[in-house]
Amino acid sequence: HKMIRLVTLSTINGGYLNFMGNEFGHPEWIDFPRQGNGWSYKYARRQWDLVDRNDLKYQYLGAFDEAMIHVVSQKKKFERTPIVKLCENDGDQVLAFLRDDLLFVFNFHPFKSFNGYGILAPTGEYEHILSSDDPAFGGYGLIDMKVKHLTRHDPLFEKDNKEWLMLYLPARTAQILRWKKPEPGETKNASKSKKSAGSIKNENKSKKK
């Protein structure tokens, strides 16, 4: 539920519609009294107390729904920002795209997690701002939200101003990271000091000899 909501919200080019009670996963539908249900009032209600009960899990979905809307609503005219697809791997069931400075990453695989998954992304620093795996949302806390990720230089993609962003993607999780663009001149200096994976491997081979 969390992943589908986020992928829907993050790809909108207009408003985001949610039905009352659906923000926390209300278990019942709404059905007003009519001839077809014998004029019953049984489902003509919303159990608003469910989201406030600590012994149930509705609170987690409600908290996530509120958090993801808050992130997107902080971006002015978010719906007008272009969607830049960075990764779409059907085999791994991984999807990643950028909207302005927000990077959305999804691992829809039901049981396969990826450690150090490489995504070609604009050069810079990325920091976590939301994770569906956060314990506050009923997750396991497998993603370290304090870690800031720096892209890794690759000469093959230097002309496109893209580098490798390595992330841990637990199964069935979604995360949002904020992209911090390099300061003017910072990219050039960083590129000089960084070594590609290939050059590092070659150096290691020469040392062994």
What are these regions (language model features)?
Residues 2, 7, 11-18, 22-209:
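Carbohydrate-interacting/catalytic domains
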